[in-house]
Design a protein with these regions (language model features):
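Interfaces and regulatory segments of ATP-dependent nucleotide/adenylate/phosphodiester-chemistry enzymes
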Residues: 93-315, 408-506
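Structural motif
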Residues: 339-341, 392
Length: 506
């Protein structure tokens, strides 16, 4: 088409997609995905930016092709991965016209649909189908909610560094980061966040080093190299990784066969910053002897509890830490007006093979059984042991990938806890908002509670997301993360951004 005579067709097999992507240089695909990821990112992933119309005239026969395209940036990983696996930098089209790349995305969507249809054949229950669909939606949600990234990053740094010091943690995060990466944690964040900021303007990763400023006496180039080496992957690494397309969420910087170090998607660079320190520490302990592997998971759970307690104190909520017994109970009992609220915190983070549109639903099911089933049992036990009449029972998940709407499907399984319509799943941002609402506007808080109960007992399709329920009732405020307790981390990120030439010139 046009001057680029490429073959497009229906994708009905892996071989079809292999033949298709071989027409393009891997470098050409990486250049095009980066360019389009910038456009979509700056638009806030708006529906207007995702919908395109392609009109292309075939130079050979004069035939005009009309094609509507829905850009799905979460599928860039699939196209890049398959391109690296099946092609290379030296064969195929390098400089793709915009319309050609959009048509390549259409073929990628066809391929994903083909693979999805095969996977769906393995789903044997409504619960399995729900897990598969919520896994699919979880990755998409991450792309569509840029603002949550900053909150998650700042909150997590506060828990790992400030709360760990305050409550004398056995984990010394500064030492672990230095040992694993060879740089101090602030320099790690400085480089990763700096690369993300610079990738909004340049594809070459090495461009970012010009805009980074370290403490006096530090070797800027050496620090930058250590961090980028840790988070980079060449084509052989990508091809041989058992992570598949998920490797770009772990190693987002791509070493091309033409000696470039490139950003493939602005989103990959953003995502790697968000939980970078957490994963360095977690992986450090996973490589320890078996009896030490759980150390960080357990300790992070304790620090997460302290974080929540600070939240309750800040908003003067009447709370009680539920006494521990031999049979495990929930963590917290809140009394807000005439409402009793039980909260069970879960700090587990889902494996990376779950966090994709073609989710490993068997692994997801296993994690749900391990996390949600256990939490439901703890909440029911606490309700009975403490003789609490009709409490609101909330499972607070640190990992916001577990969708609140999954809960009714859990009860559809053969599960001993009876669904009384008072169980909910929430993430930490939602609980911050929920607590603030209870403290500042009790009448609206009551309306939200009643709406929660109504939606949980009537299958009306409105959903059980606490965030959506609050927003639907006119509440959209989370002031807690703007508290001065987070200033050290907010200022660190602000300084990095403000030093970049683009923002300096504003």
């Amino acid at each position: 088409m046009s001057q680029q005579h490429l073959k497009f067709g229906i994708i009905t097999s892996e071989n079809d997609f292999c033949s298709f992507v071989k027409q393009f240089s891997s470098l050409g695909i990486i250049k095009s995905t980066y360019k389009l990821s910038k456009e979509v990112y700056f638009s806030g992933c708006s529906i207007e930016s995702l919908q395109r119309h392609v009109t292309e005239k075939d130079a050979r026969n004069g035939q005009v092709l009309e094609q509507d395209v829905l850009i799905q940036p979460w599928q860039f990983a699939d196209l890049i991965y398959k391109s690296v696996v099946y092609s290379n930098d030296y064969k195929g089209v390098i400089d793709l016209k915009d319309n050609m790349f959009l048509l390549a995305l259409v073929e990628t969507n066809e391929y994903i649909s083909f693979v999805t249809s095969d996977l769906i054949k393995e789903l044997h229950s409504g619960f399995d189908i729900s897990l598969f669909m919520y896994g699919f939606g979880g990755e998409q949600f991450k792309y569509e909610t840029q603002f949550i990234f900053f909150q998650n990053l700042i909150r997590e740094l506060y828990i790992i560094f400030t709360i760990s010091k305050k409550y004398k943690s056995v984990i010394i995060p500064e030492e672990i980061v230095k040992q694993e990466i060879g740089v101090e944690w602030k320099d790690l964040v400085l480089v990763l966040f700096g690369i993300f900021i610079d990738s909004l303007f340049h594809q070459d990763i090495n461009e970012a080093v010009r805009y980074l400023t370290f403490d006096s006496g530090k070797n800027k180039e050496e620090i930058f190299k250590k961090v980028t080496e840790y988070y980079s992957a060449d084509y052989d690494t990508i091809r041989n990784s058992n992570l598949g397309r998920q490797i770009f969420y772990v190693k987002p910087y791509i070493k091309t066969q033409r000696n470039g170090l490139l950003t493939a998607s602005v989103y990959f660079n953003q995502f790697i910053v968000e939980h970078s320190v957490f994963w360095i520490i977690r992986n450090y302990y996973l490589n320890k002897p078996k009896n030490e592997r759980q150390t960080f998971t357990d300790e992070f759970g304790r620090l997460f509890e302290h974080y929540l307690e600070e939240l309750f104190i800040s908003y003067k909520v009447n709370y009680e830490k539920v006494p521990e017994e031999k049979e495990k109970r929930a963590d917290w009992h809140l009394t807000i007006g005439h409402y009793n609220i039980l909260i069970e915190q879960k700090s587990a983070v889902l494996p990376i093979n779950i966090k994709q549109q073609l989710t490993d639903f068997k692994a997801y099911k296993k994690e749900v059984h391990k996390t949600i089933h256990k939490a439901l049992t703890q909440l029911e036990t606490t309700e009975k042991d403490l003789h609490i009449d009709k409490p609101i029972k909330i499972i607070l998940c640190y990992d916001n990938y577990i969708d609140a709407n999954i809960l009714p499907h859990v009860f559809e399984e053969d599960f001993p806890v009876v669904n009384d319509g008072r169980y909910f799943v929430a993430n930490i941002m939602e609980i911050e908002m929920f607590t603030e609402l209870a403290s500042t506007n009790f009448s609206l808080f009551e309306i939200v509670i009643e709406d929660m109960l109504r939606r949980n007992t009537k299958d009306n399709g409105e959903g059980l997301s606490l965030l959506k329920i609050m927003r639907d009732n006119g509440y959209n405020k989370d002031s807690y993360w703007t508290s001065p307790i987070f200033d050290e981390y907010k200022n660190l990120l602000k300084d990095i951004k403000d030093r970049h030439k683009f923002f300096k010139d504003k």
